[in-house]
Each structure stands twice: as structure tokens, then as C-alpha cells.
Amino acid sequence: MPACIDSIRECLEGAAPSIVATCDTDGTPNASYASQVQYVDGQHVALSFQFFNKTRQNILANPRATAVVIDPFTVARYVLDLAYLRTETAGPLFESMKAKLAGIASHTGMAGVFRLLGSDVYQVLEIESVPGKQRPALPPGRSLLAAVRRAAQRLSGCTDLAALLDEALASLAAEF
């Protein structure tokens, strides 16, 4: 299936851990759980880089990975073929992932243990659906979380109160 990750967006909200597999230069595989596989845009995801471990070593030596993500509502599973592009250590993506990781750590009693070192950005080359039993899909509807994110993005560019109010009203009209 071509790489259009908008159709599996629910899998990329952090509700279920993902599995990431890499290989070193001689082909030895490594698989580990990833705290986050986060949606970046229609062609890219970001994985949390928390430790300098075997997965990180493999990606730097061989920039291909495979991730298995799970839809938290239908339990559908998808395999993503990924190509590593870069690591971001500052900016909106990094801060968003850092905040989400802090929430995951706090919820699991691991506050202070997890520390985000970077957001590894990958291009999604291919998406493959994994056969198996699933729950029925939810009725189609708008993604309010995506609408909130778009509105927040628009509001973040405001430099004064008047612009903030104007943009808030425009966002409400456009998104909700």
C-alpha cells in the first residue's frame, strides 16, 4: 500500500506502544518497543530517541527501520517501512514529543527516568496491513484532536492579543 499515513492516524497518538525493528551493517536484527511513533505529516513520522542503544546505533549505520503500530480502537495492526532522515533536538516537534513522553512516564510511574534526547524523523515508504481479527471500525467522523492541533498551530504564530483573538475566532469557525 502506498505511504499515506493519514488513514492510520489513530495508530500514531501514543495509546499503544509500537515495535521497531532495525538491522546492523552485517544484517543482525534488533527489535524493541518504542514509547512514541508520532505523526509529523502525511509522509513522515517521528520516533522518540531516549537512549543511545542498539536501535540508535543501527539507525545511524543503516538508516532503514520497520515499525509495527496498532490502532487502539480496532486493534488493526500495520507495518511501516521507514527511512531515517534526521534527528531534531529542539523546536515544536521535539517539545511536543518531550511533553508526551513526560505524560507517559508520569502515568507509568517512571517520571524522571525517561528523557527525550531527540525526535528521529522518518519518511514512511510503505504501509502494509497485517491480517487478523479486528474490532469494528468507529463510525466515520472528524478528528477533533487534529482540528485542535491545527488551531493551536495557527494560534502559536500570534504576537499580540488582538491577533490572538482574531485567529482564535477564525480557527473556531474553520475547524469546529
Regions found by a protein language model. Name each.
Residues 8-9, 35, 56, 107-113:
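A generic local secondary-structure boundary/capping motif
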